[in-house]
Amino acid sequence: MSFIDEAKVFVKGGNGGNGCVSFRREKYIEFGGPDGGNGGDGGSVILEASSAVNTLLFFRYHQHLRAENGKSGSGKKKSGASGRDLVIKVPIGTQVFDSPGGSLIADLSTVGQRYVVASGGKGGVGNAQYKSSTNRAPVYYTLGAVEEEFPIFMQLKVLSDIGIIGMPNAGKSSLLSRCTMSKTKVADYPFTTLEPHLGVARINEYDLILADIPGLIENANEGAGLGHKFLKHIERCSLLLHLIDGSTEDIVGAYKLVSRELAMYSKELSEKREVIVLNKCDMITEEEIVQKKHLLEDYSNKTVVTLSLDDPLNPLLVMLYEMLQKDDIEEESKKFDPFLHVGYNKKKTPKI
């Protein structure tokens, strides 16, 4: 299945049904009076975030979304039926814009979250509503509101705890496969990964979600390579796992290149917490491992983990899990208001 993370669609709420002009016709009742019913409201187009959908592929083949029109009113003061809403499921992390690069109008980030992207038109009014003391037999009615079709633009940013980044062929897909049993394509050539992949690792009854994006090369922020197109998918990550091929000669240069591309793309992305993994250490000597690890630690001032093909991954995953848990605790502490805490009495300001 293709990974489609952008879509342009045209949406239209249903038209309102027309009001009705009708008069009561019944035996022995000479002047029955007006009894025209109101038209029903048109249906709305609604987007709903769902965990059952992973891409925006649906919109490649369904570019016009139209809700059902309301029915017209009828005699005996019967209102027309309202049009049914058109509910479309979208992946969690879908953002809706009014134009390419325009204003954000919705961010569907939780399961079940809904957004009415196109409201249905109001139904018209039947002549029964126009009856008055001065007009006992009105022939007036109103038409239902007609809704216009308009475009919206959707963009998907996948939700994950950890984003795996690095240059092409750094071993990102292999690591994701080992951690999560994700069936990503693995091969010994650059750009094996052509689209983002998600995997879930189970740690202490917690689902750790990892995202692997295509490798970054120099000038990726200007469009070179593949990774720049998918950098948006790690903007929501809490933590970055930066993989570097241990057999690379200029180990610091490789780290600087990817870090620079992140900074050029987004300041927020470059400031995310990061763990550096010196990968493929089975391809170099113990002396080189120690030397390159120290070089990375001295330059980055960040945690550096060494990893070989035969090394168990559980210690790394547990460390990542604990870092995420610490972030959650710190985030909660920032929200803590001592004045709202049970048992704390705010001092009253003395009157002067």
UniProtKB/Swiss-Prot annotation:
**What is the species of this protein?**
Anaplasma phagocytophilum (strain HZ)
User: Which EC number(s) does the record attach to this protein?
Assistant: 3.6.5.-
Catalytic EC class: hydrolase
**One Pfam assignment:** MMR_HSR1
Query: Which InterPro entries is this protein grouped with?
Result: G_OBG (IPR031167), GTP-bd (IPR006073), GTP-bd_Obg/CgtA (IPR014100), GTP1-OBG_CS (IPR006074), GTP1_OBG_dom (IPR006169), GTP1_OBG_dom_sf (IPR036726), OBG_GTPase (IPR045086), P-loop_NTPase (IPR027417)
Q: What is this protein called?
A: GTPase Obg
Q: Which NCBIfam families match?
A: Obg_CgtA, PRK12297.1, PRK12299.1, small_GTP
CDD domains documented for this protein: Obg
Keywords, ordered alphabetically? Cytoplasm, GTP-binding, Hydrolase, Magnesium, Metal-binding, Nucleotide-binding
For the Obg domain, which residue ranges apply?
A: 1-159
